[in-house]
């Protein structure tokens, strides 16, 4: 996929950016390559900023561990109060809509986190869903069932082992279709939350000196429509994932 606005990178070394290996269509592994919306956005943003980048897909928990160990940055991550103390955030690169999925037989069209009171909710291990949802989990509004990814969560939902799954709309829809659950699982009509996503680096990283360049690239590619075009093209191509 080529974009005329991109300029050749000139740095001799590559910055490492980790992404989740199991969150299609946003970020996932295909063979040895990181693919999906975020890897495509990251490569475009860094190339436009003339910064070489190596995008690596790993389990999300390991991505965060590598970030905490200052082994590289992470993309496709939400901002919360705890993370702001440790990481430097770029400008937003995308906005995700968190949807609630339930079995058709028990669907009550939840619209608020309090609608999950007393339920067992499927979440992804190591994820933050934003301060509001994270706080509700800590307060025991719902009981969290952790899985390695959306696929496992939707399998658990189909089997009746969880009551609800929290998932990004585009990603959840991919798994409902791929697992053949379209006649068994439905999603809420409105998102429970909208979360911007970012590129982040550890505050001890020497790479944070390039964040200004990265932010300028993000702003320019957003203004000329490149980021939106990339997202749409990758999403369209992932419809058959």
Identify the role of each PLM range.
Residues 43, 54-115, 127-129, 189-192:
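Acidic, polar ligand-binding/catalytic clefts
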Residues 14-85, 146, 224, 233-234:
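Extracytoplasmic small-molecule ligand-binding "clamshell" domains
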Residues 42-51, 91-92, 115-117, 128-148, ...:
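Ligand-binding cleft/hinge of the Venus flytrap
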Residues 7-14:
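Sec/Tat signal peptide C-region and signal peptidase I cleavage site
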Residues 61-72, 88, 114-115, 151-170, ...:
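Short helices/loops that flank or line small-molecule/ion binding pockets
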Residues 17, 24, 32-44, 104-139, ...:
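Bilobed "Venus flytrap"/periplasmic-binding protein-like clamshell domains
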Residues 39-48, 114, 119-120, 127, ...:
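Extended ligand-binding regions for polar small-molecule ligands
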Residues 20-22, 96-98, 179-216, 237-241:
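Periplasmic-binding protein-like
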